[in-house]
Amino acid sequence: MAKKFNYKLPSMVALTLFGTAFTAHQANAAEQPQNQSNHKNVLDDQTALKQAEKAKSEVTQSTTNVSGTQTYQDPTQVQPKQDTQSTTYDASLDEMSTYNEISSNQKQQSLSTDDANQNQTNSVTKNQQEETNDLTQEDKTSTDTNQLQETQSVAKENEKDLGANANNEQQDKKMTASQPSENQAIETQTASNDNESQQKSQQVTSEQNETATPKVSNTNASGYNFDYDDEDDDSSTDHLEPISLNNVNATSKQTTSYKYKEPAQRVTTNTVKKETASNQATIDTKQFTPFSATAQPRTVYSVSSQKTSSLPKYTPKVNSSINNYIRKKNMKAPRIEEDYTSYFPKYGYRNGVGRPEGIVVHDTANDNSTIDGEIAFMKRNYTNAFVHAFVDGNRIIETAPTDYLSWGAGPYGNQRFINVEIVHTHDYDSFARSMNNYADYAATQLQYYNLKPDSAENDGRGTVWTHAAISNFLGGTDHADPHQYLRSHNYSYAELYDLIYEKYLIKTKQVAPWGTTSTKPSQPSKPSGGTNNKLTVSANRGVAQIKPTNNGLYTTVYDSKGHKTDQVQKTLSVTKTATLGNNKFYLVEDYNSGKKYGWVKQGDVVYNTAKAPVKVNQTYNVKAGSTLYTVPWGTPKQVASKVSGTGNQTFKATKQQQIDKATYLYGTVNGKSGWISKYYLTTASKPSNPTKPSTNNQLTVTNNSGVAQINAKNSGLYTTVYDTKGKTTNQIQRTLSVTKAATLGDKKFYLVGDYNTGTNYGWVKQDEVIYNTAKSPVKINQTYNVKPGVKLHTVPWGTYNQVAGTVSGKGDQTFKATKQQQIDKATYLYGTVNGKSGWISKYYLTAPSKVQALSTQSTPAPKQVKPSTQTVNQIAQVKANNSGIRASVYDKTAKSGTKYANRTFLINKQRTQGNNTYVLLQDGTSNTPLGWVNINDVTTQNIGKQTQSIGKYSVKPTNNGLYSIAWGTKNQQLLAPNTLANQAFNASKAVYVGKDLYLYGTVNNRTGWIAAKDLIQNSTDAQSTPYNYTFVINNSKSYFYMDPTKANRYSLKPYYEQTFTVIKQKNINGVKWYYGQLLDGKYVWIKSTDLVKEKIKYAYTGMTLNNAINIQSRLKYKPQVQNEPLKWSNANYSQIKNAMDTKRLANDSSLKYQFLRLDQPQYLSAQALNKLLKGKGVLENQGAAFSQAARKYGLNEIYLISHALVETGNGTSQLAKGGDVSKGKFTTKTGHKYHNVFGIGAFDNNALVDGIKYAKNAGWTSVSKAIIGGAKFIGNSYVKAGQNTLYKMRWNPANPGTHQYATDINWANVNAQVLKQFYDKIGEVGKYFEIPTYK
């Protein structure tokens, strides 16, 4: 969009740095504010994960029968008691769909049973208005209630005459009735057969006008009863037959006639019933649909009076005895159990969260395992592989939310599909059940995600895959399951797919469910009532208190009457809102336990909104006698305790939650915990009178496992914490390991050491380091892509002093990671790329893609990676305690590694076998391979290439000795240190081990390696080594030299704060010198102490941070934050503080770029800038123009480029490509072209014409002229206006609350991260920073 440039930086900056959706609201910002709601921000995707997962969790239970859907039996709907007026449980309520109740006119049928021994009286009573079901039984000889049994018989079709009734013969089958309990209906299906000696004939002679259909609670879409005990009785099915019960005292014939409105077809069925008691039955028919991701009326299957369906029967595509067995047994799928693990990672699929593209069939390949054993093993080894679900003959257990990918089918399959494992079974029936369960689960997932079944087995395209198909068509894995396992049971994937396909058609009501007869149903009548019964359900996150006068709690919102509750005047959580017609309800539950109580009418509660609780760590004062509650906004019925003591007591808060406009905190005071309103708390203040200095010198020491970087300004390292003065250290601004923390009186220390070798350096004061927590490293085996120019470090969270190397090459390079460690909230991976090894932040890594970029998210390990040998270039010291050495990585046992312990060896190969990674040790002198050792048994460093380095040195009096190998141990020492003092050393070659240089040469007639730091080079023989880096000159009072060994020198004052590009370095008498180019082109020598990696200035604001935050909080346009996707809300105090705290921001390697000075050119080369401009339309190869513009007008090159990329749509806009204006209209046909790459003068009402006019008047006849000329306008109008950093643009610390370019508190953070990404892309870093400081 073109911008109006009549104002200060408006929304241009808000859009300058890609991907931000933050609007400027201030008076001096854009005249046309942006519509925030229309922006899609990548930051919102992470917040949306919770919503996607929550939506998916609404449907987690499979139906209990083959034709059912994923009808969710949610605990939010308490089951009603079964009584003579039974209510119907509505499983759709929690699926947030609508429910339609349809009443139908039913034809009634009379069935009489010939039974000479039966003297019971059967009668039918129908209540046409209530449509309720009364089952009563009378038995004069027994007080027990008999159980109604219904016997279904298979109907035969007579096709001789479609216009007339057909006669069928049917045989009776003897049955035995059972009486398990009252008010239950057990139905028994009896097939028509010829295995009985007695045969009776029935003929349809009349049609009846009354229908008796028992009403059954807890029914699902296909009319089956829910089996809450998960018991599968194959001799009984859950269908209801339409029957009429007539009084019969003697042998008689019973006839039933069905009339359907289906053209030219009549189906007549005969049934035989045996009754054990006198019964009355009245029928209610309800219809509802399976769950769908889109809202639809629920009008599908009905619990009809007979096993009939208007849908056609499914015709199997393959002949399968097992599938026929499943159909014949009418197998039910069990409920889907959830066994999620909190520490499993959650990554979106390549199309986003909640968007899988299909499902993959796996088998566990383990004949001896169980489903519980498989899941337990997976949880222990989830870093190698984990899947979404396991299925066996009895259970379906979902182990990971299907809205997120899993690691089960290789990197390409993981990005796309749901992975489900079949656990091995061993008998025919169990195997059939497992196939039924898998097919039901697969069909449910396809239906849920609106995917149609399509086998990918033969063409690699579809929604149903085997692991073998993934291997064949996508790659990244070599597995071939589940074919071998299926064949072992005389089954095939084609049969399984056919079952999945049939299940899907049943669930989507395209074919008739199992156990039904295909026929046209009776026409439904209009709803009996005029009330709007549409149900809508939405998620809610509030709290409520039930009023003393209320209508009670409702089990379902369809209940006509609520039941009494003891939760009156208690604060309860509200999780859902439901509307049914004119009635509105809240679903309430216990705040702490989550126990569901039921639905309550909205008019019966006092309701308040509630934000999610957040963790805090704050201390307050609270008066004695104050009340603590078990819940926030608690009532007298929810008192936890009273604050004891007298006067103010210390309350330590750990949680905070906002209820409406009030804030409640949870914490502990005097050993008692609970919630209290912030109104009753005051901030703990320091004593007004100075206290006497503490004389407590008690020492406490604790173990620690963190990392730290020593600040440039420090008091040194302490040998013991009792030392009064520290020693100067060269370990500043390096990442060190922290192994212990100590407190001595009011002083606190960390014990720091080398991260890789474990060598302790000493104690450092805690306030003189930047400290981060660190988890233990874990072994991994993953492959990523990394851009050239990215730095590898010798340690995780490494600094510029710990660079191991730079990624070389063009385009994405393959990074093979073997270790992973979490530092604070960031993840670092150790691995190898192009022969170089080191640590890289996961931020710079992306998952490899096969053909196209699948996702910007890093997708970790495939299920099992094929072993491969990598070439590495490292050196290692074998630990004293090791697991031995192997001749081959395949050896199950290792030989003793004692003789290799505490020795240094070269490593040139690395291989992962199973869950272990091994390295090949090589003798450093003979280059002979020695054997493989586990990578955990060695300490490794990168080793450089040996180079010729001829020179003469003297060995320092204090040295470490001469060794047979660089970085050797005492076991490899050739000459002791005391024999080398002040001796001449003649060097012939050199090599770097990590950051340390070692020289190879001769001393005292012995030849070996010695550390360069132990040598003093003769001034006439100083040797230089290549070194490439750009420094900033930081000492205006020092000098540069044409020859560092001579006295001639020249002042650095004219070059102060300019960049100095180094090409080589050397040490002369212990002083490091750099040789490079000044900005005026001179090549000179400068001492390292006169240079800095980056120039940081601090600007004092004159106010406290709290004062600045209070000013921001009182603005008319409040600072904004997105706690939920696309929903802006006022940021709270802690959120604003977090965004404004310059100390915190400056310590973050990415966020500190909001302090980058945009008014300071960095003098980057045109070649480097062209890397950012590759493929950017007319801006491609314009690096020289941007470099010239930046230098000429004093602007940061990266900022200038990012500005142009946004305004030109990556160099593709017509305004950038150029044109002319003729007769007030834009044209490209005049032969003249004028370009505008910053949208200057391009007003919204006619942006193209106005922008070209401006360019024409300015004479911008080329893209380069437009860049240079436009930069002048940008510099003078915006950056030079005083707010020369992103932080200043957002918060304006010089005058808080005025002239701020955005209201979003994260605006500067996000833009800073984008700037950092640009620098990383070209392998550079920012050089000039200005950080405001508060009192």
Swiss-Prot record:
Residues 533-610, 612-686, 700-774, 776-850, 868-943, 945-1020, 1023-1096 form the GW domain. Residues 58-88, 100-127, 143-155, 176-223, 244-258 have a biased composition (Polar residues). Residues 303-863 are annotated as: N-acetylmuramoyl-L-alanine amidase. Residues 51-88, 100-262, 514-535 are annotated as: Disordered. GO terms for cellular component: extracellular region. Its EC number is 3.5.1.28, 3.2.1.96. Residues 1-29 form the signal peptide. It is found in: Secreted. GO terms for molecular function: amidase activity; mannosyl-glycoprotein endo-beta-N-acetylglucosaminidase activity; N-acetylmuramoyl-L-alanine amidase activity. Residues 515-531 have a biased composition (Low complexity). Undergoes proteolytic processing to generate the two extracellular lytic enzymes, probably at the septal region on the cell surface. Residues 864-1335 are annotated as: Endo-beta-N-acetylglucosaminidase. Keywords: Cell wall biogenesis/degradation, Hydrolase, Multifunctional enzyme, Repeat, Secreted, Signal. Pfam families: Amidase_2, Glucosaminidase, GW. It catalyses: Hydrolyzes the link between N-acetylmuramoyl residues and L-amino acid residues in certain cell-wall glycopeptides; an N(4)-(oligosaccharide-(1->3)-[oligosaccharide-(1->6)]-beta-D-Man-(1->4)-beta-D-GlcNAc-(1->4)-alpha-D-GlcNAc)-L-asparaginyl-[protein] + H2O = an oligosaccharide-(1->3)-[oligosaccharide-(1->6)]-beta-D-Man-(1->4)-D-GlcNAc + N(4)-(N-acetyl-beta-D-glucosaminyl)-L-asparaginyl-[protein]. It is an enzyme of class 3 (hydrolase). Coiled coil: none annotated. Endohydrolysis of the di-N-acetylchitobiosyl unit in high-mannose glycopeptides and glycoproteins containing the -[(Man)5(GlcNAc)2]-Asn structure. One N-acetyl-D-glucosamine residue remains attached to the protein; the rest of the oligosaccharide is released intact. Cleaves the peptidoglycan connecting the daughter cells at the end of the cell division cycle, resulting in the separation of the two newly divided cells. Acts as an autolysin in penicillin-induced lysis. As a bacterial surface-associated protein, mediates attachment to polystyrene surfaces, contributing to biofilm formation. The GW domains are responsible for directing the proteins to the septal region. Oligomer; forms a ring structure at the cell surface which is important for efficient partitioning of daughter cells after cell division. This is Bifunctional autolysin.
